[in-house]
Amino acid sequence: MAKMRVYEYAKALNVSSKEILTALKNMDLEVNNHMAMLEEKAIKKLDAKYKKGGARAKSQKPAETNKNKQPQGVNQQSAGNQPNKIRDGKKNDVQNNQFNKNKKNNNNKKNKRNNNNNKNQHQQKPVKPKKELPEKITFSGTLTVGALAEELGKEPSELIKKLMLLGVMATINQELDKDTIELIASEYGVETEEVIVLEETELEKYEEPDNEEDLEIRPPVVTIMGHVDHGKTTLLDSIRKTKVVEGEAGGITQHIGAYQIEENGKKITFLDTPGHAAFTTMRARGAEVTDITILVVAADDGVMPQTVEAINHAKAAEVPIIVAVNKIDKESANPDRVMQELTEYGLVPEAWGGETIFVPLSALTGKGIDELVEMILLVSEVEELKANPNRQAKGTVIEAELDKGRGSVATLLVQTGTLHVGDPIVVGNTFGRVRAMVNDIGRRVKTAGPSTPVEITGLNDVPQAGDQFLVFKDEKTARSVGEARASKQLEEQRSDKAKLSLDDLFEQIKQGDVKDINLIVKADVQGSAEALTAALQKIEVEGVKVKIIHTGVGAITESDIILASASNAIVIGFNVRPDGNAKSTAEAENVDIRLHRIIYKVIDEIEAAMKGMLDPEYEEKVIGQVEVRQTFKVSKIGTIAGGYVTEGTITRDSGLRLIRDGVVIFEGEVDVLKRFKDDVKEVSQGYECGITIKKYNDIREGDILEAFVMQEIERT
C-alpha cells in the first residue's frame, strides 16, 4: 500500500484534514499537521475506522454514492413495478417524476456539502500556484517590500531575506528607493522602468502648450563666463556704460545680476555669472537659461581652469559660444596664443576654418564692444529664438533674498509669456501675487515679456535660485499648488532619513568612525548661500567631513545661535551680521560666529579648522640606545638595569623598547632614570646610568634598550 499525506487521505474520503488528525490522535498516533506522511499501519487503522458503521456515509466518494444508489433504485423500480407501469402509465409517470425530484434534491444537498468540504480543503491548503517572473516591472517613485514582492510574484519573506543578505534590515511595509528596487529586480533578472507621473504639485501639469503661429522673435539671453579676473564684469559694465565693478568685494562678482540693453532697436539680456570656482553651481544655472555664451579669456593669461569649466558648462547646455579675447590693450597680450589653446577644446576660430566667433576687445577702453554686440545679434538671428508673449508667464528664478523693508524679493527671468503686476504666481515652493515689478535699471514696470529680467515682491517666502515659476489664472489655485509643493518638500526632507537606501549603507561602511564639523551658513542672497555650501562640502580632509546643519538668507538671528548651540555648530556669516540678540545669545552659549565677505577666506579658515580637528599623525624617532651591562633586583622597585649609553641620548620622558637578540620583547616607558644616586632628566652618549622600565622587570644582561619619541607630523 502506497504512503499518503494526511490531506490526501482526507480528500479521498471527502472529509476534513482536521477530522483525520483528531482520529489519529485518538488512536495514539502522533501526527504534526495535514502535510505529515501516513505510514501503512496508520492507513490500515483509518480504513478500519471509516469502513464501519456511522462513518460509512462519509467514507464514500460522491461519484461512487450516486453511481451505486441510482442503478439500485432504478433496478428495483423496473423489476417490481413493470406490470403496473404498463397498466397505469400516468400513475407511474407521476411516481417517477416524484422520485427524480427527490433524487435531484438529495444530489443538490450532497453536492452543496461536497462543495463546502472542498472549500475547507482549499483554505487549509497553503500551496499557491507559482507565478512566473515578469520580464519587466514599472514603478513610480518608491515601492514597499510587499508591493515589490507582488510585482515580482515572490513572497515578501524571500525579498526580506535578500535584503538581509545585503545588510539591510527591512519590514514588509518599508519603502525602497529606486536603486534598491533595481538591485533586487536584477537579482531575479527582471528589467525595471520608472514611470514619471505628473502630480498635482507639478507645474508642467498647468502649463499651456504653444502653437507655432503664436510664437514671436524674442531677445537672446546671453551669459558671460570665464576665469576670475579676466574682466567679465568690466566687459558687462562697458556694454551697459556703467561702473558697478568697484563695489564688488575682492573684485569678484558675488551673485548673479541680470541686465538688458538695446542696440538698433533690438534688445539683449545679459546674465553676469561670477568667475570664481566656488560659484560652479551658479554658473551651471546660468548656462541652463542662456541662449548664447560669451567666453571671456584674457589675452595675457590665456586658458585657465575656470575657462575650461565654463566651456564644459556651455557645451553641456548646447548653446553657441562667442569667444571675447579681452585685455588686448596690454603689452603682454597674445591673442594668437589664446586661439591656439582654445582649439584643444574644440573652439576653432572662423579665420582658421572653424565655426567659433572670436572677437578681440578691450573692456577697459571699449574697443571691440560694438563688434561683439553685432555678433550676438547675428548669432541670435541664426538661432531663430522665439516665444509666445500672449500666454501666462513662465521662467526661472535668477536670484532671491530677504529684504527688511520689502520682504521676499526674487529676480526672475521671464522665458515665455508676459508677467503682469497682480498675477497669481507659484515660484518653486512659494506662492503669492506679484505686488510690484522693478526692471534692471530700478524703474517700476507693469509688464515683462519674454527674455526680460525683473525683480518682484509679494511672495510668501524666499524661493531658491534656479526654481521655476508659473503664473496661474486665479490666486486660489496658485495658493493650493504652492502650499502642496511646500508640504511635499517638507515630507521629502523628513522621509529622506526614513527611506531605505543602499548608498547610505555603503557610505557608512566605507567611512567608519568619521568626525563631523557642523556648520550653519547664512548669506545675503540665496545664490551665495548655495555656492558657499557647495564649496564647503567639496573640502576633502581625510577623516573629517563637513555637515551643513542649516542654510539661510538674511541676518544671523537668535534662533540660528540656539540651533548652533544645540548641534555644536560654527556659524558662518557671508556678507551678513548678527543682530543684538544673536550676539548676546552667542556669548552666553559660547557659540563661535565667523563673518566673511570673501569666499577664499571662508574656505581657508574652515579647511584649517578641519585639519586641527583631526587626530594628530605621529612619526617615531629613535633618540638613543643603552646597552645593559648589569642588573640589580631591589625590593619594592623591581629590576634596575645598569647600562651604558652607546648612541644618542636617553630621556626620562621617552618611550623605551627592550630588544633581545634582535627581537623586540617589550615596549613601554622609562620609570626611573638615575646617574649614580641622582635622578636626572637625560643621559648622553658615553655615560653610564641606572634605569627601570615601568611595569616590567625581566631585564637581562646584554639586552639593548632603545629610546624613542613620537613627533607630530604637520598635515598638508
From Swiss-Prot:
Alphabetical list of InterPro entries matching this protein: EF-G-like_DII, EFTu-like_2, IF2_II, IF2_N, P-loop_NTPase, Small_GTP-bd, T_Tr_GTP-bd_dom, TF_IF2_bacterial-like
Record's keyword annotation contains Nucleotide-binding: yes
Chain spans, region G2: 251-255
Record bears the keyword Transferase: no
Compositionally biased spans, kind Basic residues: 101-113
Subcellular location: Cytoplasm
Residue segments, region Disordered: 50-136
GO cellular component: cytoplasm; cytosol
Biased composition (Polar residues): 62-84
SUPFAM superfamilies for this protein: Initiation factor IF2/eIF5b, domain 3 (SSF52156), P-loop containing nucleoside triphosphate hydrolases (SSF52540), Translation proteins (SSF50447)
Predominant location category: cytoplasm
Location of region: G5: 362-364
TM spans (from-to): none
Region annotated G1, chain positions: 226-233
Source organism superkingdom: Bacteria
Bias (Low complexity) ranges: 114-126
Residue numbers spanned by region G4: 326-329
Biological process per Gene Ontology, one example term: translational initiation
Listed PROSITE patterns: G_TR_2 (PS51722), IF2 (PS01176)
UniProt GO molecular function: GTP binding; GTPase activity; translation initiation factor activity
Binding site for GTP: 226-233, 272-276, 326-329
Region (G3): 272-275
Entry keyword set: Cytoplasm, GTP-binding, Initiation factor, Nucleotide-binding, Protein biosynthesis
Function (record text): One of the essential components for the initiation of protein synthesis. Protects formylmethionyl-tRNA from spontaneous hydrolysis and promotes its binding to the 30S ribosomal subunits. Also involved in the hydrolysis of GTP during the formation of the 70S ribosomal complex.
Similarity annotation: Belongs to the TRAFAC class translation factor GTPase superfamily. Classic translation factor GTPase family. IF-2 subfamily.
Protein name, entry field: Translation initiation factor IF-2
Organism: Bacillus subtilis (strain 168)
Name of encoding gene: infB
